[in-house]
Amino acid sequence: MNLKMKKLLNGETIISREPGNSMTPILKSRQPVQLEPATWEQVEKGEIVYCKVKGNYYTHKVYGKNKKRGCLIGNNHGHMNGWTKNVYGKVIKILPPK
């Protein structure tokens, strides 16, 4: 089990630093974000979530919601990762990059 996922499922608020440029300019590579626990039902279109899609973990945006399929997850450049109900947390604060 992924450590971030485990902490979020245990109700912890955590700091996460994900590598990559898929969320620029909103998030830079390894820019810290504060995540609080959330389920797919609790998040809204446009929010940034920590989730698992097709076996991969992402800090990406919610582009849509559907009762049968969950959330449509994608990066900030228009690439869609797919639908998932495996949402573990949402970004509540974007912290300054180091």
Question: How would you name each of these model-derived features?
Answer:
Residues 1-98:
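Extended hydrophobic leader/signal-anchor segments used for secretion and membrane insertion
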